[in-house]
Amino acid sequence: MTKRPSFIRNWRDSEAPAAPPGAAEDFGFASELTEAAGLGNLRVAQLRIPPGLRAYPPLAMRDLEVFAFVLEGAPDLWADGYLHRLAVGDSVCLTAGTGIAHSLINNAQGDARVFVFSLAMRRGEKVAQPTDSSASEQLAKLGMLWADAPKRKRGPNSGKPGDASGRKRGRPDSVVHWREILTTEQSRYPDSDEDQGFNARMDNRARLSRIGVHVEVLQPGQRSSWPHAERDEEEFAYVVSGRLDAWNDGYITPVTEGDFTGWRGGTGITHVMINNSEADAVLLVGGERSRAVNQFWYPFHPSRNKEIGKTFWADHPVPRLGPHDGLPDALRARVPAVRRRSAVAANEAARFLGKRKTKKKK
């Protein structure tokens, strides 16, 4: 595309103080990425926590699942009164309803940057702040206090920056580095030979049911999926490292580290991420997981539309697609010239290029 789409934003363009004006405590900075990209069902933000600050007071959410991913620095996860040092590439997955109180505190020397993801907070959400009685009183006045939160044994740490008590050597089950669970086999669609990267499924490991999130490693010449659109669910892709082309309705936008692309459900915008560079690219890919029904449409794979049966989005909007066929350059070069005359023919032919015996996409 000649013009960068409004739903592609870099965290640097929307960063602002995390605390409201006049707040009693400085919580560093936040880039509200889903707000900038126009998504309403998800909350995705990048937090920048300077040394000696915390991202938020210790709290527990009744209904929200929370995912956090360390992009830079060495922040501490505060969980139920204990400190756990995190490193770049570590992720934290917290399921709903456990009552685990948590915070992110930067007790290190340099800035910490953390990617956080959950569903957007809904009316009726309940919150517990076990270390702050005045905050609990305020929550009660607002009708937001989670008064019957599970009682949990709390460690000695106060949850304030600079308090070094209660530091644990080991990691809780909620923390894992993405490389530890990265698949050793490439992902593919059923009955396809096209390799589409390695995945670390954080959501499956943590048994998350409301949000889906995984780390995806795309090698040169690979794409994250086939071009598609979703009827019901919002989704996003965030570039952790590397250079990619964001393909949207037949047009290409170069994206790099820190770029966020968010797609609203129902718009019919067909999309895929393509690695046409000479190095691996690492993505965070996520979205809603709680919809009972979701439907899809593949503009260049009519055979796939037939295969998915009731999940085919039959009355999808019909976009005016641009000239790009959605194929990585290296993959297109392997498609016979006679098949490259049509985007549909080229993509269907690419389905059967590659090696067999590889993990298939769901």
Sequence positions of predicted segments:
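Polar/charged low-complexity regions in secreted precursors and cytosolic/nuclear IDRs
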Residues: G22, D26-G28, T34, G38, ...
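Conserved short histidine dyad/triad with adjacent acidic residue
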Residues: D26-E32, A45-R62, G99, D195-N199, ...
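Short strand-coil-strand connectors
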Residues: G40, D80, S209, W247-D249
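Ligand-binding loop in jelly-roll beta-barrel domains
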Residues: A96-G124, G265-V293
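Intrinsically disordered, low-complexity polybasic segments
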Residues: K355-K362
